[in-house]
Amino acid sequence: MNANWNFDNSYARLPERFFTRIYPTPVSDPKLVVLNHSLAKELGLNAEVLASEEGVAVFAGNRVPEGAEPLAQAYAGHQFGYFNMLGDGRAILLGEHVTPSGERVDIQLKGSGRTPYSRGGDGRAALGPMLREYIISEAMHALGIPTTRSLAVVTTGEVVMRETELPGAILTRVAASHLRVGTFQYAGRFLSKEELQALADYAIKRHYPNGEHASNRYVFLLEEVMKKQAALVAKWQLVGFIHGVMNTDNMTISGETIDYGPCAFMDVYDPETVFSSIDTQGRYAYGNQPYIAGWNIARFAESLLPLLHDEEEKAIEIAQKVIEQFPALYETYWLQGMRAKLGLWTEEAEDKKLIGELLHLMYTHRLDYTNTFRSLTLEEWHFCEQELRDWYTRWQQRIARQDMTKEEVYECMRQNNPAIIPRNYRVEEALAAAVEHGDDTVMERLLHVLSDPYAYMEEQEEYAKTPEPSDRPYRTFCGT
């Protein structure tokens, strides 16, 4: 029996300045903590072999499967607005696995040792942050939001030094690719036009093959990435997800959410909500995310300028015409999603005002974002405040004007308003049990209820509860 790995490594065929070939650093005593059986099945992999000693050795970096070509990717990026040379400092791409259906996915080991891009770091990861990424990335997938996935987490048998000694771990991340805006910034700043063109052609072939026949394939690439990112960030906003570190190296060309370091979900609705301990200025606050996405797309456009037109002025003009569409594009996706959350399948000019009024009421009355929509969906709008009751009446009048039965309206809402999100305090409970006490059952229960967030199951009731009020704000940390 074998695991059914099927590697074909197209990124490794790019010019060599895009990566460094390097093997993972072996670890002393790897142990499997969690394996994603459903994802393994989707990938055509044998879960039984993956869970064996041989499979765990692959997840730990102690064994490289046949056909893999391990490498660390080079990229740059704006981090909190400042440009830096970066790269995979603690992650190694084993290669690209091609599934039985022909889908190509990256298999990356995160926390697998030092690389030439480690910049003084130890190349390792702690168990808590790796389990956190596993939980939240799988929850995001269940919510219907494009995301990298998590195949497994193993402990290494070694400790990593952060504020204190922590158990070391490695996450196996699965992605459509790890091409980033920062990959293009690296090529645009440090490499030749020919190398930049090779990267752009590769991205088009891998992610946007229709662009191979476009009149200007590089304008097409810019437009498609912009659309994907506008749609992605709209989906984040619709569920109250705050990424926390929207640097350009964390914006994928594929349109998947990547890097779950300091992310969290908003409880009480407040556009200024920030959880990340390092985001002291609120650059990546909930309400800023659409603007930052547009800013990042502008950086992507800058990196593509040499390919858009031979004359720089004309290239800039072309880029500006594309990126100035981002705000309207984002709003279209967001309004479409908000209408669905309110059971509105027709469009009326006053819809934006109705939505804005609800958000304002949530803000002034400090209402929980997720549970407000949940209350509407379950017809449990039991508020005493007159302005909340008045808004409810206006909403009822609005849904009555469309040709849908009441049952159809509420079914639409159930499909678009999750009964449950990964509440920050629930995630922390699961991590504390797993990391401090070696008890994975809390995490397993949480993963189970998060696996079908639109089910409105009785067992989700407990997990839908908001956290107890606290004087201390919830803070997230990068885990690096």
From Swiss-Prot:
Cofactor: Mg(2+); Mn(2+)
Protein's UniProt keywords contain Manganese: yes
The keyword Metal-binding is assigned to this record: yes
Assigned EC number: 2.7.7.-, 2.7.7.108
Lineage: Bacteria, Bacillati, Bacillota, Bacilli, Bacillales
Classification via PANTHER family: PROTEIN ADENYLYLTRANSFERASE SELO, MITOCHONDRIAL
Annotated ATP binding sites: 87, 89-90, 110, 122-123, 173, 180, 259
Family as reported in the entry's similarity comment: Belongs to the SELO family.
InterPro entries listed in its UniProt record: SelO
Highest taxon in the source lineage: Bacteria
Function: Nucleotidyltransferase involved in the post-translational modification of proteins. It can catalyze the addition of adenosine monophosphate (AMP) or uridine monophosphate (UMP) to a protein, resulting in modifications known as AMPylation and UMPylation.
Species annotation: Anoxybacillus flavithermus (strain DSM 21510 / WK1)
GO terms of molecular function: AMPylase activity; ATP binding; magnesium ion binding
Recorded catalytic activity of this chain's protein: L-seryl-[protein] + ATP = 3-O-(5'-adenylyl)-L-seryl-[protein] + diphosphate; L-threonyl-[protein] + ATP = 3-O-(5'-adenylyl)-L-threonyl-[protein] + diphosphate; L-tyrosyl-[protein] + ATP = O-(5'-adenylyl)-L-tyrosyl-[protein] + diphosphate; L-histidyl-[protein] + UTP = N(tele)-(5'-uridylyl)-L-histidyl-[protein] + diphosphate
Gene: ydiU
HAMAP family: YdiU_SelO (MF_00692)
Transmembrane segments: none
Protein name as annotated: Protein nucleotidyltransferase YdiU
Enzyme active site: 249 (proton acceptor)
Binding site for Mg(2+): 250, 259
Keywords assigned by UniProt, alphabetized: ATP-binding, Magnesium, Manganese, Metal-binding, Nucleotide-binding, Nucleotidyltransferase, Transferase
EC class name: transferase
